[in-house]
Amino acid sequence: DGYIPDGEMFARWAQLGAFSPLMRFHAKKDLFWHPARTCPDGWDGGSRLPWEWGPTVLESIRNSVRLRAALNPYIYTLMRAAHDTGVPLCRGMYLDWPERDEAYRFDQYLFGEAFLVAPAMRPSGDGQHGVTERSLWLPEGAWYDYFTGKRLEGGCEITRTSDLRSFPLYVRAGSLVPMTEPGDYVSAPLTTLTLRAYAPVGNCRTTFDLYEDEGENFDYEKGLNRRTLLTYDCSDGIQRLSVETPRGDYPEAVAERTCNVEIVGTPKPALVTVNGVVCNTWSWDNDLLTVRCGTVSA
């Protein structure tokens, strides 16, 4: 009925909300749930204010909100695709694997093409800081644990243990995910763009047609929007990320932005180039390559 019984439940709801079409914390006009309910300490609880639940829950919810905001370019593009094609943002596993029993048996789903979401379903028992575990199915192919960067081979059922800082969230190898710095509101201009790729096993070619519009009006119905084709190409040990010239425009579109590239699960490169010029503004740590490309034309 929307009542929040404990902090652990609140944090898990926020994690699920971050990977839902709509994320919000309110269910009615009040900050607290009324009428009052009996709680062990005499306090009604039910608050929708994350800081009312202590530092551990606050940190967990803050991380979920930041992750949701960082994924806004990915989510906004897929919401436009859902509008155009009817293919939902949240997809049952059976849409991609209709013949597999596991696709119906596990309560998990795809969030676009890249993410596999398996929400934490069982409480730890202490209501705040505990560890819980759940089983899930990883389809064939390689998948990355989003929170650790560890690569796993699919085609199996696994058990994942998590505290409130994480939950079972996996990214398909070969994926290209556009991200941004979390801002004050989701329709803020896309002035910072991070292209995060997840290294495949072998060769691959992945595209993502990034969509942008003003975000707060209906001018997109008049064709006022912009699309930018992003490509991640891996072949013979060479990885390439390319950004094509945008198609279309709208008055509020940014003319330039800060661009970064991240590649998860890649060995340390011998050479990095940007537009054919040797680049020295890169770092590599624990199989994560980060390239700071600076300000580029949008």
What is the meaning of each model-derived region?
Residues 6, 54, 213, 283-285:
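Alpha-helix initiation/capping motif
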Residues 113-114, 141, 237-239, 286-289:
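Beta-strand-connecting loop/turn residues
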Residues 118, 146, 242-244, 292:
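Beta-strand residues in well-ordered beta-sheet regions across diverse protein folds
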Residues 169-277, 286, 294-297:
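Accessory, solvent-exposed terminal regions and/or long lumenal/extracellular loops of proteins
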